[in-house]
Amino acid sequence: MNNILFVALGGSIGAVFRYLISIFMVQLFGSAFPFGTLLVNIIGSFLMGVIYALGQVSEVSPEIKALVGVGLLGALTTFSTFSNETLLLIQSGAWLKAFLNIALNLCLCIFMVYLGQQLVFSRI
């Protein structure tokens, strides 16, 4: 039961961060490209790499994994919004933006997981 509370706490924090980041990015760049979703996915991927690597080199408590890995990062990142925004770009005929959104999300997020892991592993 404790882990459920940690997931809920982390999820509420992650959801608020996602909302604030998305609003900030729309104010900064407009809404022609989903920069907010891209940024939260990049941040979340980096942090997931850090959490994973920390778990490989030391003991990460189940509560921290629930709070950060499942709750915070689960609510911060969003595959469903990425998918919907990409489909909307395709439906509006913005094929290049849709392809760019797919490529950036996949490539940058995988790279950020790697970068997060390497940051931890290089400090050992």
UniProtKB/Swiss-Prot annotation:
Q: Which family does it belong to?
A: Belongs to the fluoride channel Fluc/FEX (TC 1.A.43) family.
Q: Which GO terms describe its cellular component?
A: plasma membrane
Q: Which organism is it from?
A: Shewanella woodyi (strain ATCC 51908 / MS32)
Keywords, A to Z, come to: Cell inner membrane, Cell membrane, Ion channel, Ion transport, Membrane, Metal-binding, Sodium, Transmembrane, Transmembrane helix, Transport
Which InterPro entries does the UniProt entry name for this protein? FluC
Q: What protein name does the entry list? A: Fluoride-specific ion channel FluC
Regulation of activity is described as: Na(+) is not transported, but it plays an essential structural role and its presence is essential for fluoride channel function.
**NCBIfam families cross-referenced by the UniProt entry:** crcB (TIGR00494)
Q: Catalytic activity annotated for this protein?
A: fluoride(in) = fluoride(out)
Q: Which residues cross the membrane?
A: 4-24, 35-55, 70-90, 95-115
The main location is membrane
Briefly state the protein's biological role.
Fluoride-specific ion channel. Important for reducing fluoride concentration in the cell, thus reducing its toxicity.
Q: GO molecular function of the protein, one example?
A: fluoride channel activity
Q: Give the subcellular location.
A: Cell inner membrane
Q: Which residues bind Na(+)?
A: G74, T77
PANTHER family xrefs: FLUORIDE EXPORT PROTEIN 1-RELATED
- Look up and give the membrane topology term: Multi-pass membrane protein
Entry's Gene Ontology BP terms = cellular detoxification of fluoride
The lineage's top-level taxon is Bacteria
